């Protein structure tokens, strides 16, 4: 699923920060106390657009890390400057030194990783004592009410039996060496995403019919036969608030 973000078509429909957005990233940085003296790591920075906006807004130094060579290539071409650097590396094994950041921002990267504890472990290593983690993630408010098709789709992304409720995220973050400062559901983010997804599906269905889009290439081959039903059920779940979004601010505990 991670490779989907580098597709030009995906970026055209959803933007560079999906399923988050730049406004939420700025808000998280404000709430997390980012300032011009901060050393911020943006884990899963994509093509660097949000990193550049945050750097300009707060005047801080940012190290952006992403596992996609294509996205890092775009970031280096479009945004690299003295206060903004980008490197391609796995999010759970970066080349950065221990305790090199006062703040770390990551947007939905835990949501789509089958072992988010590994990324949280790397985050703990990268942050200094009392460093601040600011992350935003997909949230399932009540999985028992979801349509079977939606649960299959979410299992494809999250893995089976993962608790992605607000409480589930809090428990996961705290279990990996962080103290939660604030956890907030961001319903307006998912409302905006629902509109984007609805518009995008018109184009995606056309491409699928004409052979221009292969779900297997996107890691969604298991949904090929029921794609329309899955999409419609997912849109309904978003309308009903069963699929939402959340933001979290936490402090690194001492090792």
Residue ranges and their predicted role:
Residues 117-132:
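A short glycine-rich, Lys/Arg-flanked "PGG" loop and its adjoining helix->strand segment in the class I
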Residues 47-93:
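Class I SAM-dependent methyltransferase SAM/SAH-binding core
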Residues 10-27:
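Conserved SAM-binding loop and adjacent beta-strand
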Residues 92-104:
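A short acidic, Gly/Pro-enriched loop at the edge of an enzyme's catalytic core
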Residues 138-160:
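Short, glycine-/aromatic-enriched active-site segment of Class I SAM-dependent methyltransferases
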Residues 162-176:
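Short alpha-helix
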Residues 184-255:
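Conserved Class I S-adenosyl-L-methionine
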Residues 103-115:
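A short SAM/SAH-binding and catalytic strip from SAM-dependent methyltransferases
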């Amino acid at each position: 699923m991670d490779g989907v973000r580098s597709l030009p078509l995906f970026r055209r429909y959803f933007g560079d920060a999906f399923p988050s957005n730049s406004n939420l990233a700025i808000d998280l940085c404000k709430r997390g106390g980012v300032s011009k003296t901060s050393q911020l790591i943006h884990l899963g920075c994509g093509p660097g657009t949000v990193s550049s906006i945050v750097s300009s807004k707060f005047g801080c130094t940012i190290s952006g890390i992403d596992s996609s060579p294509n996205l890092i290539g775009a970031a280096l071409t479009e945004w690299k400057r003295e206060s903004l650097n980008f490197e391609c590396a796995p999010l759970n094994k970066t080349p950065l030194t221990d305790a090199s950041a006062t703040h770390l921002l990551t947007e939905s990267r835990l949501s789509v990783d089958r072992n988010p504890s590994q990324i949280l472990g790397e985050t703990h290593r990268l942050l200094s004592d009392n460093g601040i983690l600011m992350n935003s993630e997909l949230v399932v408010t009540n999985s028992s009410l979801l349509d079977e098709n939606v649960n299959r789709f979410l299992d494809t992304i999250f893995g089976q039996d993962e608790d992605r409720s607000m409480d589930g995220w809090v428990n996961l973050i705290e279990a990996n060496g962080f103290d939660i400062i604030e956890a907030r559901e961001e319903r307006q983010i998912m409302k905006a995403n629902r509109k984007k997804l609805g518009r995008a599906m018109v184009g995606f269905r056309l491409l699928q019919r004409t052979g221009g889009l292969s779900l297997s290439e996107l890691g969604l081959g298991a949904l090929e036969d029921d794609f329309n039903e899955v999409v419609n059920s997912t849109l309904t779940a978003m309308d009903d608030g069963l699929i939402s979004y959340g933001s979290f601010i936490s402090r690194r505990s001492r090792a």
